[in-house]
Amino acid sequence: MKDEQLFYFEESSIFKAMMHFSLPMMIGSLLSVIYGILNIYFIGFLDNSHMISAISLTLPIFAVLMAFGNLFGVGGGTYISRLLGAKDYIKSHYVSSFSIYSSLVLGLIIAVITLPFTDQIASILCASGETLNYTSDYLKIEFLSTPFVILFFVLEQFARAIGKPIISMIGMLSSVGINIILDPILIFGLHLDVVGAALGTAISNAIAGLFFIIYFSRKNETLSFNVKHAKPTKAMMQEIFKIGIPAFLMVVLMGVTGLVVNLFLATYGNYAIASYGISFRLVQFPELIIMGLSEGVVPLIAYNFVSNKTRMKDTIKVVIVSIAVIFAVCMTVVLVAGHSIVQLFSTDPQIVVLATFILKVTMTSLLLNGIGFLFTGMLQATGQGRGATIMAIAQGTVIIPVLFVLNSLFGLTGVIWSLLIAETVCAFLAMFIVYSLRNRLTVDKASLIEVE
């Protein structure tokens, strides 16, 4: 590894290292919000509600593809960071090559399986009538691009894993920028409508993925694109999947949770859904900043888990303090000006009152949410597969029984408070798991550097 990478992993101040790894991730997390609304924004100019609905309905599919990217990106990436901490650059070649080519093969398999059934999948996503055709057309392009989408997410994770978070951010920026350029050309210039929006996303992911490939092929000594290195061993696959599978499950289950929350809110009318939508988008920004902070330091924790546990512990302490400061600032703003902020999005008195209440409740959960993210990332970084799996399942399922109980007891108020209660349970569960594993957070370097 180059001296600059080693400097942030081993020598710089904790705060400086944290910002080096996390700031690009924070920006990237915020970019993901923009990425999610780009196609809807441009299609909106066509004034066709069926097209807008079609793109909205396909968002869960993109989330699932991102989850598959986590399977090898997070699983392989955290393992690579630990190998770098053990100074085993040779084995990192095998892990990276296996993960890269496996993600491509997985993408091809998904494309082959799904392409003949786009109409049926569109129906499962609740598309009907004219919307069904638009949704199916969008899905065809999305599934065709699956290998490139998954590879993009894997390589973006690898950039952070080897201490190149700025390269990760540049890759994400290029993807968003290219999409912004292509969407109007394809949608309006070539009159491709929904297909144009899908093509814009597919091409931007492919080009961003190509950027990563070119960069890593020329300027790195820790990753390998040599197919001869894509030879998995049982131990290697265990290390990758014991973290990759929980990371995959977490994204999928959290998507299911979002659908369940919407189903409960729908029983109370459009004003409840609208109020939640406003508060969700407002909380999403500080939440994504904290998520970027927590996920950004995962390579730093993974590296020092092997090389310097004191630095690892100090990193966790600094991140917790940073999360607390962000929470305090955001909570103060909401308590002082929450009502006025909500009024920027709606003038309906009923929506403003309910959205302000939801905003205060969900913002209260921000601190606990941040701790949950951090400790889950810590479990991933240190290779604690069982703990990471428990947290992934908990973050996606705990809220469901809480919703049923509180909804039956307190109605809409119970549904709203269930969000905070579920986050509280998950945060304390994460703390309990980390505490119970405190004596197991050790590593046998021989197990990391053995090359079979």
UniProtKB/Swiss-Prot annotation:
Alphabetized UniProt keyword annotations: Antibiotic resistance, Cell membrane, Membrane, Transmembrane, Transmembrane helix, Transport
Record's bilayer topology term: Multi-pass membrane protein
One Pfam family per UniProt: MatE
Gene Ontology CC, one term: plasma membrane
Coiled coil: none
Transmembrane segments: 26-46, 54-74, 98-118, 139-159, 170-190, 194-214, 245-265, 282-302, 318-338, 351-371, 390-410, 414-434
InterPro entries: MATE_fam, MATE_MepA-like, MATE_MepA_subfamily, MdtK-like
Cellular localization per UniProt: Cell membrane
GO BP: response to antibiotic
Gene Ontology molecular function: antiporter activity; xenobiotic transmembrane transporter activity
Listed NCBIfam families: matE
Purpose of the protein: Multidrug resistance efflux protein.
Family membership: Belongs to the multi antimicrobial extrusion (MATE) (TC 2.A.66.1) family. MepA subfamily.
Protein name, as recorded: Multidrug export protein MepA
Organism: Staphylococcus haemolyticus (strain JCSC1435)
Gene: mepA
